[in-house]
Design a protein with these regions (language model features):
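Short glycine-rich or small-residue beta-strand-to-loop segments that form or flank ligand, phosphate
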Residues: 66-77, 102-108, 168, 280-282
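Histidine-anchored nucleotide/phosphate-binding helix
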Residues: 76-96, 295-306
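Short internal beta-strands
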Residues: 98-109, 311-316, 366-371
Length: 420
């Protein structure tokens, strides 16, 4: 008997697997040794010493009296508490003091963070010394700067738009809608208005992105916005599920991002060389399973490795339940998934757009969910609630005709086409 574990919230769920019974592991590429906070800081500082396509940040800061830093929110693995101190050191060297710096949490349309969450996000070294703001996507809190060639209004957080030195941070990993995270995503959707975000995301209906590849119309639309509100310096990192930095790149927002994408190439994508009758998947634990809105990424990834008609067991704690008020409202008031899909095809809306992802999975697979999500939400999603992971595993393992796979970090493990 072998013991495996599924990351779940801030803990894990163990399950037993019978000896001799085949269980395929589908995992992303993360080193098992040599990772630490000290090593992460070393990689960040090395990158800051060798910016790509720009002078050092300290030189860029010289002559400016203010700076703003965009950071990822708490649903992301990006270790802002590690990125901020070296960035602030560079700014101080260039003559910009702590009190002249504003940090904006690039929430996009996600919920605002509490004081305790902000402290955890930026770290004790920074909290209380530098002003930290939750981004507001309300149009009245943003300034209109132009329109992209694809019609996306460029409406940006007023504090960010008005600042003479704009710095973006973030993590690089595949993204279902825009191909890859990091780079300009800190600006749009991170610090943009709801109108900007919705118009850009709507492009994803016509233009499918390949995970890990920024060369698609949706991402190109984001980068076009830089003509109206440039990012002056970028610091991006590639991190694993424990927030350890694996690679870092900084400098010009396009050039440094592309280098980060190159460094991350193939790390988070796994070739779909086979599909399985059953897939056991974890969203990857906290923060990837804070809410169903985020955990659905793992479900979509697992579905790519599941045969049509097959089943998926998803472990995602979802302490914040659905995690998006508008999506929850649609689920509770419309209930019929096909009605929701039809409405989204008429008019795309961010939040409810996750129903399209849900429908994509449920049209081909059945989904079993182990979660803290209230049962009525589980049923509204079209899933079967499972209180006992081991019981499901035992039933599947007992059927020798079934091929079964295990994905411990589903939100970080994206499918790619096998090599020809």
């Amino acid at each position: 008997m072998t013991i495996y574990s599924l990351p779940y919230g801030k803990a894990s769920i163990p399950f037993r697997w019978p000896a001799g019974r085949k269980l395929e592991a589908i995992v992303y590429d993360s080193p098992e040794n040599g990772l630490s906070r000290v090593q992460s800081l070393r990689l960040i500082r090395e990158a800051l010493n060798r910016p790509i396509g720009t002078p050092r940040l300290s030189q860029l800061a010289s002559g400016h009296d203010r700076a703003v830093i965009l950071i990822s929110d708490g649903t992301r693995l990006c270790p802002s508490d590690l990125l901020l101190p070296p960035l602030l050191e560079e700014l101080r060297t260039g003559g910009i003091a702590y009190e002249a710096v504003d940090i904006v949490i690039a929430l996009g349309l996600h919920r605002k963070h509490t004081t305790d969450e902000i402290r955890s996000l930026v770290g004790n070294e920074v909290f209380g010394r530098v002003r930290v703001h939750n981004h507001s996507a309300m149009p009245e809190d943003c300034v209109a700067l132009g329109t992209t060639s694809r019609g996306t209004p460029v409406e940006i957080n007023r504090l960010v738009a008005d600042c003479p030195l704009r710095i973006a941070t973030g993590g690089i990993e595949p993204h279902a809608l825009v191909g890859v995270s990091g780079g300009v995503k800190a600006l749009i959707p991170g610090a943009a208005s709801c109108r900007s975000i919705e118009h850009n995301h709507r492009l994803s209906v016509q233009h499918l992105a390949s995970p890990g590849d920024p060369n698609n119309p949706v991402h190109q639309d984001l980068e076009e916005a830089l003509r109206f509100v440039p990012i002056h310096f970028l610091l991006n990192v590639v991190v694993n599920h424990e927030r350890h930095v694996l690679q870092a790149a900084c400098g010009d927002v396009i050039a440094a991002h592309r280098e980060g994408v190159r460094l991350a190439a193939s790390r988070f994508t796994v070739p779909v060389n086979a599909q399985y009758d059953r897939v056991i998947v974890s969203a990857g634990g906290y923060p990837k399973d804070m809410q169903m809105y985020q955990a659905l990424k793992a479900l979509r990834n697992a579905a790519a490795f599941t045969r049509p008609g097959g089943s998926i067991l998803l472990a995602a704690r979802c302490e914040e339940h659905i995690g998006n008020g508008l999506l929850q409202y649609w689920l509770e008031t419309m209930k019929d998934r096909q009605q929701m899909v039809a409405k989204l095809n008429e008019r795309f809306e961010v939040g409810p757009h996750k129903v399209l992802h849900l429908d994509e999975v449920l049209a081909r697979h059945s989904v079993h969910l182990h979660s803290a999500l209230p049962r009525h939400f589980t049923e509204l999603l079209g899933f079967k609630a499972e209180d006992d992971v081991q019981a499901v595993v035992d039933a599947w393992a007992a059927d020798e005709s079934l091929t079964i796979a295990y994905m411990p970090y589903g939100s970080l493990t994206y499918p790619r086409s096998p090599s020809p």
